[in-house]
Amino acid sequence: MARAVGIDLGTTNSVVSVLEGGEPTVIANAEGGRTTPSVVAFAKNGEVLVGEIAKRQAVTNIDRTVRSVKREVGTNWSTTIDDKKYTPQEISARVLQKLKRDAESYLGEAVTDAVITVPAYFNDAQRQATKEAGEIAGLNVLRIINEPTAAALAYGLEKGKEDELILVFDLGGGTFDVSLLEVGKDEDGFSTIQVRATSGDNHLGGDDWDQRVVDHLLKKVSSAYGIDLSKDKIAMQRLRESAEQAKKELSTATSTGISLQYLSMSENGPVHLDETLTRAQFEQMTQDLLDRTKKPFHDVIRDADVKLADIHHVVLVGGSTRMPAVTGVVKELLGGKEPNKGVNPDEVVAIGAALQAGVLKGERKDVLLIDVTPLSLGIETKGGIMTKLIERNTAIPTKRSEVFTTADDNQPSVLIQVFQGERELARDNKPLGTFELTGIAPAPRGVPQVEVTFDIDANGIVHVNAKDRGTGKEQSMTISGGSALSKEDIERMVKDAEQHANEDKQRREEAEARNQAEGLVYQTEKFVADNSDKLPEDGKAEVQAAVAELKTALAGTDAAEIKAKSDAVAQASQKLGAAMYAAQAEGGAAGDAGAQAGPDFTKPSASDEDVVDAEVVDDEKDK
């Protein structure tokens, strides 16, 4: 049975985890890191770079490097590189492919199934796009689950008490969520984790804190040199990297230095930046971002109808929660209660996803997870009103139906427009899709009965059905938002991703063949040089000719030619080595003959023949 993994597909970093003997383990990537930067780069030679290696080359390849694409998931955003358009799903799929590859390398077997996490406040289009990214990467997405829910799953299973409330404060690289969950455990150790309420902001995260530092540095350069660097892509990339590093350093230090030499050129010469940024300055310039975390927190407490004193545990999730100001605001919101710092904020979500994967695959049978839909779902009715069929924070999966009628006499069809959100007017909410139910029998307005059914599956993805009770005609659709990919698009992208995987494998094999060939040249030349006086001339000439041909092949790019010439050098070297040892053996035999004739030679005595260098004794037999 193929293994299932849990994946935290993050804005800035991603993590993959797997159950080993029923317990979750975070898998280190090929570079040795436990988190993989969610960065994809397209090298000019056609190679696709993912993770740390893509992040490191961003300064010199900025136009061909994509980062923080999670913020664009579920939208019509795309980027064009080498005349090819890439969607957020395709870029995300590259990251997922790397995580899949690293997991397979660690496990030594194929990985086909995955549970992928998304921010709790992701809408339907964003969830659908994430699922599509998994499919493009060659994964069977068992479930899409909310990040705070996964974190609570990882944290809550360790708790022994019944009916505890856990608040998860999740501030990542690009998104923010607050969720309140109830964790119960019965006498048999079976855990039930139920989401009580969730809220958030899909465009609030560590990237925004970084941008404030970048803006601050741009002003400093402008006032010192009178130039605007915001259009200088390379300078902006260097500023972004320095801003991110400064943010991290200010989590432990009260001030940090930012030094960027030769950042750009001005009329008066090179532009250098040497700045000191204090934690107080940093917190002042980002205070409004911090304030934006407060409303979702209060919304969750209100929706769940609980008192702050009822909350047993507070879990911080996401690398951005390491900032002291964030920890401070959480403590302030909780009336002085200290958040729990016993979990790794970068890894806890992936660990929860791996646990859920284990539940779905039958590896863990001691937990039930009940999630909720983060936003209300409804349709537009007369007057542009948003008529809700499923309210936010409803447990999923769920199914709701309601009967509507026509607005005009003899109306032959109705247009079903589906929206997601909390506003009273449909136009102020997120449009998810539109479809038409036709063939309604002629009748006065108000007479036909059209039953509209909303069905939200365990992934939080919406399915809608409309049925005319009079004629029995019905129309269905799976809502997938404006960014949705057709089945043909997904299949094409899957093939494209597989092709790139094969190309990457071929490149690795070519690089290995080249490395082995270069090593073979070095070893062979060293062997010939070290043993020149002991080697036959004809054998030396053959090896040197083979090495020369291999060097010529290495100057080119034909991997098959390099391998063939390497084999020729190896064979010639083996022959030469055999000839050298044969010559030494002959010389040794002649020496033995001379020694036997000499006066000092004595035959071994009978006792000498019985001498052995060492003997293994089995003590057990003697006992």
Swiss-Prot record:
KW Nucleotide-binding (keyword) present: yes
SUPFAM superfamilies assigned to the protein according to its UniProt record, in alphabetical order: Actin-like ATPase domain (SSF53067), Heat shock protein 70kD (HSP70), C-terminal subdomain (SSF100934), Heat shock protein 70kD (HSP70), peptide-binding domain (SSF100920)
Span list, region Disordered: 496-524, 583-623
Organism: Kineococcus radiotolerans (strain ATCC BAA-149 / DSM 14245 / SRS30216)
Organism classification: Bacteria, Bacillati, Actinomycetota, Actinomycetes, Kineosporiales
Protein's job: Acts as a chaperone.
InterPro entries found in the cross-reference section: ATPase_NBD, Chaperone_DnaK, Heat_shock_70_CS, HSP70_C_sf, HSP70_peptide-bd_sf, Hsp_70_fam
Protein's name in the database: Chaperone protein DnaK
Listed Pfam families: HSP70
Entry keyword Phosphoprotein: yes
